[in-house]
Amino acid sequence: MSQNTKGAGLLISAIGVVYGDIGTSPLYALKETFAGHHPIAVTPDNVFGVLSLVFWTVMLLVTVKYVIVIMRADNHGEGGSLALLALVTELTRGYRVYYPLMLLGVIAAALFYGDSMITPAISVLSAVEGLEVVTPRLTPYVVPITAVVLTGLFMIQKRGTGLVGKLFGPVMCLWFLVLALLGIVNIVAAPHVLGAINPIYAADFIVKHPMMSFFALGSIVLAVTGGEALYTDMGHFGRFPIRVAWFALVLPALLLNYFGQGALLLSDPSAIQNPFFRQVPEWMVVPMVGLATCATVIASQAVISGAYSVARQAIQLGLLPRMTIVHTSGEEEGQIYIPFTNWTLYIAVMALVIGFQSSSNLAAAYGIAVTGTMMIDTILVAFVMALMWRWHWIAVAAVAGTLLLVDLAFFFANIIKVAQGGWFPLFIGVLSFTVLTTWRRGRELVRNQVKKLAVPLDVVMRALGPNVSRARGTAVFLTAATDGVPPALLHNLKHNQTVHQRVVLATVMTADTPYVPDSERVTMTDLGDGFHRLIIRYGFMQTPDVPAALELCKAFGQEFNMMATSFFLSRETYVPSLNPGMAHWRERLFTFMTLNATRATIFFKIPTDRVVELGTQLEI
């Protein structure tokens, strides 16, 4: 396959995965701005003002902020809030801002889940609502059809999306071409609408109608939802294909369609009830509903896949308990399925569809999570500018300060929508933040307790003496600590009075980078008397595999026969205590999460018939 063919394939794939969310925004962005909870009169001045705001919002928040600036801040090729967090915490380790920035990154991850629940619901609803343009008699069927489409989407997740995924790119390319064509047809009828590119119209609208424009920002932000996906999906496709796709197809198609809808409103203000489908010729509405539904399903799939990816990163970075991770492709490391995440999302999405009933009602809930995440991305990347790129502080203040002011304006414009539905992403954000921070703090308390009770290895080795029997074979003790003796070894010695001929104290660690190559996977140290310390490293985008890591120990002259190797694990039971460290209810939550975590044998891919689990009880 030639380099050009590969590049074209990557470009089309990027269009299918990266741009689904932002690509379906024309379905509802202008409609909600003019006819949402804070309606704006459809006058020529207002249309020009809103179009100008949409244009400059897309240019500033997506083109300048993400495409030009933030996409430079990759973590060894990976993007997204957690990848950026890992990069920034590495840069600021030892600084006072370390923990506040860590908390900000966790908040961004928590807000992401609120967003990932709303996107499938609002996208598919807005597409199916096109049937109402055909005839109002179809209105009662909008919610049931949406529910069926979304149920089908979530049910096929466990089978993987590799085969269907090959269609995503061509379908989205067709979608963007149709968006552009519809826009051009309407612009030709009123070409003067292109004058709204002039920022004077946006400024004039803000000055003349400060309150109205403030409310408008809360809906205009819908035009850039999904903009952060350009950065999040960078690891899958690379910076270059995403940028080329944006400038060559996606950006022109989006802007042409928004200006086309604006041109339609200038000639027919009544079209505001659904300007997207009203710009479509009558004979084409039903096929367009079909294409729009396909596009919104693709947008939803991208968000669902992103939720799996963020969950895996959170598990690897110690923010979530172990979960079952299923690889749905033998070729692509990134194609995974996490059952718990999938069904949690499904329940939340269905509750939103049934509870809110329409895309207009859901639009009020959309925006807070997106603008919050965008604001945190700006703050984190400011530290990358200063500490990694070595920009002068004036340049950092000018670029990051300007972007942060824009983010803040949109964030506060969305905060006022709390009572109308904005409470939902905030509720999910608080819930997710509580879970993430409780797990992280709980694991920290456990490590401290284990460290306190740990016995130094040299003490144990001296205590062994010549009388302790040595069993044949190898014993691998999995431990979170990189020093001292794991509780499982002490229990084995205490109760069985024996130690294996070869003892390996293995620790699986997660690096601040997305991937660790096999050449750097393992480090083995000979401690003497048959004892070895093994450090196994994985990136936060990788899934641990302990037996595969043991195979790499041949480089250190150590070979492992799985049939002669036993794996010893500590099965820890946590007892909430009155000791300072965590609130009692959080201790109970941590204990509950531990009980429901995926067993270490499954998560680390250890053969279950070679495992010995020894129970220990710890107070936290």
UniProtKB/Swiss-Prot annotation:
Topology relative to the lipid bilayer, per the entry, is: Multi-pass membrane protein
Q: Which residues cross the membrane?
A: 10-30, 50-70, 102-122, 138-158, 168-188, 211-231, 246-266, 284-304, 336-356, 368-388, 393-413, 415-435
Keyword list (alphabetical) reads: Cell inner membrane, Cell membrane, Ion transport, Membrane, Potassium, Potassium transport, Symport, Transmembrane, Transmembrane helix, Transport
Question: Which InterPro entries does the record cross-reference, listed alphabetically?
Answer: K+_transporter, K_trans_C, K_trans_N, Kup
Q: List the disulfide bonds.
A: none
What protein is this chain from? Answer: Probable potassium transport system protein Kup 1
Chief subcellular location equals membrane
Q: Name one GO cellular component term.
A: plasma membrane
GO MF terms held by the record: potassium ion transmembrane transporter activity; symporter activity
* Keyword Membrane among UniProt keywords: yes
| Described purpose of this protein according to its UniProt entry | Transport of potassium into the cell. Likely operates as a K(+):H(+) symporter.
Q: Does the keyword Lipid biosynthesis apply?
A: no
Q: Which reaction does it catalyse?
A: K(+)(in) + H(+)(in) = K(+)(out) + H(+)(out)
> What is the organism field in this record?
Rhodopseudomonas palustris (strain BisB18)
Kindly list the places in or outside the cell where this protein is found, as annotated in its UniProt entry: Cell inner membrane
Identify the HAMAP family for this entry: Kup
What does the similarity note say?
Belongs to the HAK/KUP transporter (TC 2.A.72) family.
As given in the record, the signal peptide range reads none
